[in-house]
UniProtKB/Swiss-Prot annotation:
GO terms for biological process: phospholipid biosynthetic process. It comes from the Bacteria. Pathway: Lipid metabolism; phospholipid metabolism. It is a multi-pass membrane protein. This is Glycerol-3-phosphate acyltransferase. The lineage of its organism: Bacteria, Pseudomonadati, Chlorobiota, Chlorobiia, Chlorobiales. Catalyzes the transfer of an acyl group from acyl-phosphate (acyl-PO(4)) to glycerol-3-phosphate (G3P) to form lysophosphatidic acid (LPA). This enzyme utilizes acyl-phosphate as fatty acyl donor, but not acyl-CoA or acyl-ACP. It catalyses: an acyl phosphate + sn-glycerol 3-phosphate = a 1-acyl-sn-glycero-3-phosphate + phosphate. Probably interacts with PlsX. Keywords: Cell inner membrane, Cell membrane, Lipid biosynthesis, Lipid metabolism, Membrane, Phospholipid biosynthesis, Phospholipid metabolism, Transferase, Transmembrane, Transmembrane helix. Belongs to the PlsY family. GO terms for molecular function: acyl-phosphate glycerol-3-phosphate acyltransferase activity. Its EC number is 2.3.1.275.
Length: 235
């Protein structure tokens, strides 16, 4: 039990690193939560700080999710405080990743008011189901390119994930996942692309959560007042 609590606590603290707020303070001396949508995540960083900074914030927030779902779990597997949790591996990684997402949304370092959790959740899923997430990222980027709405891209990508898992698992009959091997700098590396049913259930819950946290964006989209990303105007 102590090991599980440690995994969740460390993952929460990693997720709590307020990337967007730190970028705003360091680059412009502002709290980005007082501008734009009032959010501390990557979407508002794009809007307030420009696309380059917004992209950097988003990538770091993604890395937080990957680290929680992969590295934190792996560390405590090799260095348990007591008995390592007897939990399905994918379910455990999801718990760690979600703890990081909670940290991102309710960051202890910034008054428990952070981002929406999209990028950190994406990072968690990249660590667990990288091939499926490559498809989701493709949908995300294409939607931004065509619509210039980061919020629309985030919501569409969230809905696409459980659908992609279901299609690959049941229509293409890929079972619980596939193992991939790549050669890098003369070394053979392997990674597992999971299609565990826990991912579908989780994906549906996340999609609903993302839609809920974007309800203000949906209202702005319907009223025609949602801001678009314009590439090249900010540095």
């Amino acid at each position: 039990m102590l090991t599980l609590l440690a995994i969740l606590a460390v993952s929460y603290l990693i997720g709590s690193i307020p990337t967007g707020i730190m970028a705003g303070k360091m680059l412009k001396g502002i709290d980005i939560r007082k501008f734009g949508s009032g959010n501390a995540g990557g979407t508002n960083a794009f809007r307030v700080l420009g696309w380059k900074t917004g992209l950097t914030v988003t990538l770091i927030d993604i890395i937080k999710g990957v680290v929680a779902a992969v590295s934190v779990v792996a560390f405590f597997r090799h260095h348990p405080i007591d008995v390592f949790p007897d939990i399905n591996e994918v379910a455990l990684r999801l718990l760690a990743g979600m703890s990081a997402v909670v940290g991102h949304v309710f960051t202890v370092f910034a008054g428990f008011k952070g981002g929406k959790g999209v990028s950190t959740a994406a990072g968690m899923l990249i660590g667990i189901a990288p091939v499926s997430m490559l498809m989701v990222i493709g949908i995300f980027l294409l939607t931004i390119y065509l619509s210039r709405y980061v919020s629309v891209a985030s919501m569409l990508a969230a809905v696409a994930f459980p659908l992609i898992i279901a299609i690959r698992k049941y229509i293409f009959e890929l079972g619980s996942g596939l193992d991939y091997y790549i050669k890098l700098f003369g070394e053979q590396l392997s990674f597992h692309d999971s299609l565990d049913y826990h991912l579908m259930i989780f994906g549906l819950i996340v999609a609903l959560g993302i839609l809920y946290t974007h309800r203000a964006n949906i209202r702005r989209l319907l009223s025609g007042t949602e801001n678009r990303v314009t590439f090249g105007k900010h540095s």
